[in-house]
Design a protein with these regions (language model features):
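Residue-level recognition of conserved beta-strand positions in structured domain cores
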Residues: 46, 55-57, 137
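Acidic active-site catalytic centers that drive phospho-/nucleotidyl reactions
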Residues: 14, 76, 127-129
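Vicinal oxygen chelate
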Residues: 32-33, 42, 72, 81-145
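Short, solvent-exposed coil/turn segments
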Residues: 3-5, 37-39, 48, 63-67, ...
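Helix-adjacent hinge/juxtasegments
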Residues: 57-85
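N-terminal beta-strand motif that seeds the catalytic metal site of vicinal oxygen chelate
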Residues: 1-17, 68-70, 136-145
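Core segments of cupin and vicinal oxygen chelate
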Residues: 2-3, 9-51, 79, 86
Length: 145
């Protein structure tokens, strides 16, 4: 049985500010629906992704900016980092985990520079609310992925 991740709900404080930010990343605006009362749903999709994000009003009880560890897979982390910086995003330097497996929480065990292996290099940025995203470079997928 296939199960595919379709959407991630992000907690944000200011829907319009978040919409401007994610559109500035080059993400496709799929919907901006205003419902009854204060209910609103905005959906955007990163380039090449089958999974979208949604945020709005009345969607989640999670506090704005509370998500950490959202992953965006890229095939060239340096080029993606440069493009995001050119779009006005504050992106960390490229790093890898000193333990060589996966990045630790926060900034612990960050080693400077790329790992020069698929799955091993990361960079991070946050949206205006503080939801933290990670770029992860994958050049060759593991079998079955």
């Amino acid at each position: 049985m296939d199960m595919k991740l379709e959407v991630v709900i992000l907690p944000v404080a200011d829907v319009d500010r978040a919409k401007v930010f994610y559109e500035s990343l080059g993400w496709r605006l799929d919907a901006d629906f205003v419902g009854v009362g204060a209910f609103r749903v905005v959906q955007l999709t990163p380039p090449g992704s089958a999974c979208s994000i949604i945020f709005g009003s009345g969607l989640t009880s999670s506090p704005p900016g509370s998500y950490d560890g959202l992953q965006l897979v890229v095939d060239d982390i340096e080029a993606t980092r440069t493009e995001l910086i050119e779009r006005g995003v504050d992106v960390s330097e490229v790093f890898h985990d000193a333990g060589g497996v996966f990045h630790h929480a926060g900034h612990e065990a960050r080693a400077a520079g790329p790992a020069h292996q698929s799955y091993g290099s990361f960079a991070s940025f946050s949206d205006p609310d503080g939801n933290e995203w990670y770029l992860q470079e994958i050049t060759t997928r593991l079998p079955g992925r």
